[in-house]
Amino acid sequence: MTKPLPLEVKRSRRPTSRACKFCHFKHLQCDATRPCKNCVKRNIGDSCEDIQRRKYGSNGTKKRAQSAQKVQSDSPSASSATNAGTSAVNESKLESSELPMVAQQTQQTPRGLETIPTIPHPNAENNSSFLSPTTSQMFNTGSNTLMDQLKMSVPENNSMYQHDTLFQPPKKYENNSYGYVNAAPQGQHMFYVGYSEPGEQRASPDAEKEPGTNLNSPSSYLSQYSHTQSHTNSQLTNSPSVVYESEIAKQEELQLTSFVEAANNEELDFFDMDFTQRPFIRLLENNTMVSSYPNNSTPKFFDHSRSHGRIPNTAKEVPTEIQQDEEFTPPLILRHIIKNPDDIYLTRVVKAYQYPKAYHALTKYLKTRFERTQLIEIAKCMSKYRPSFISATKSLVENDLIFTERSFQRSLLEYESLISMSAAPTIIWRRTGEIVALTNEFSVLTGYSRMSLLSKRTFIIELMDDESVVNYFKLFSSIAFGDLNATLLTNCVLRKAAQDDYLRCACVWTIKRDVFDIPMLIVGQFLPVLD
């Protein structure tokens, strides 16, 4: 460590304009002699030389300054701002005196939005007063062409954004008697219910004309809401420009409009309604069902599927003896063997699953059940995703297939423990449609025993009517390689174990994928739709 110098030595030294390298690095006071006293004292006088300083404005600094000046001179915004500076100041004085509210709104504009051009409303009359004469002339000449382009690109009912739909009802189901759950018009998302952002407030045109209206008060908000709803409903029903591409969407919109109009005309008190008169189904702890229908049954849905009643119900059949071969092991046997995660890796029962054999069995069942026109429609859906499954598994070795099957059985153990704590009737099946697990609530609701569904190769489509099967393949083909965490809300008609007995259900399908992003299993939860 350098000792402090005496006061006499400090006064005798004169500071120099350029230090040596050592003094500059050590932050010491250097002198004009070379070698300096600090270097001589440390026996490094041979290396004492002046530090080379970089000149100001040389190399990069000068080049950056020149490039910045060139960019400023080349930019049109700088030249236009310089030329129109005086006129903008004069116009701002006039605008601040005539339109103080506009000036306040301009000052509160968030950063990053100053460069976004504002398109004047085509119906506004006083928009020219907001702009300078040059800008006003530019908007007047170009606004017509721009608004025509916007009208061509945006539909007339532009309050609803168009999305790529995941659930579009086919034309075959337009006259379906039981319809779809949350079936949106074609071109809209299936979950669209007129959603708006949480922080967004939509007021009626009357509220815009009356600045003194307080939208935060309940009475004014309800009046504005009823006015907006009635105005929207009248536009939907009376506007001839609304074109429905689907009959189901049209009927749904008309029913919704009539319901809203009836609710606005008649003040209903929902707290005075007698909820005991509503239909219900209750599952007891002893695995029995109690409902409001005669003989504790479920509502009948047989009129729309008379052709399906002629096909024997193979799902309820229980084999006399469980047949086990090398290519297929019934899920009931696997459930008795695999009871904890260690059994998956220690037993030799878990092998590579034969998905081609499963698809062949599925094709054989479809040919015995459906007609040619329906088979062609199902085949088109299966052709969209079956080659992808084959190409994805073609490069996998035997150990990879064993690994995917072990992952399937491990995930199935977790899902079985999860659905056992849920009161919703739940059933799990493979991507081929083979049922692998179900809850007691599902057995009570449909009448199928665990023995009948898990002791043989049973497909989930055996529990559905014809129209629900076609709809199932259409939906599955659309999400097979879509969202990695796909959850689908739809409805279907389940075929119960009793003869000619059907049950309409709303269902939620959750798809679980393996490490190769291929659908591994589907968890379906069903709730009956009561009339």
From Swiss-Prot:
Transmembrane segments: none annotated. It comes from the Eukaryota. Residues 411-483 form the PAS domain. Residues 124-134, 213-238 have a biased composition (Polar residues). One of its GO terms (cellular component) is nucleus. This is Glucose starvation modulator protein 1. It is found in: Nucleus. It holds the Pfam family PAS_13. Residues 75-88 have a biased composition (Low complexity). Residues 20-48 bind DNA. Belongs to the ERT1/acuK family. GO terms for molecular function: DNA-binding transcription factor activity, RNA polymerase II-specific; RNA polymerase II transcription regulatory region sequence-specific DNA binding; zinc ion binding. Residues 199-211 have a biased composition (Basic and acidic residues). Keywords: DNA-binding, Metal-binding, Nucleus, Transcription, Transcription regulation, Zinc. Transcription factor which regulates nonfermentable carbon utilization. GO terms for biological process: cellular response to starvation. InterPro entries: ERT1_acuK_gluconeogen_tf, PAS, PAS_13, Zn2-C6_fun-type_DNA-bd_sf, Zn2Cys6_DnaBD. Residues 56-134, 197-238 are annotated as: Disordered. CDD domains: GAL4 (cd00067). PANTHER family: GLUCOSE STARVATION MODULATOR PROTEIN 1, ZN(II)2CYS6 TRANSCRIPTION FACTOR (EUROFUNG)-RELATED.
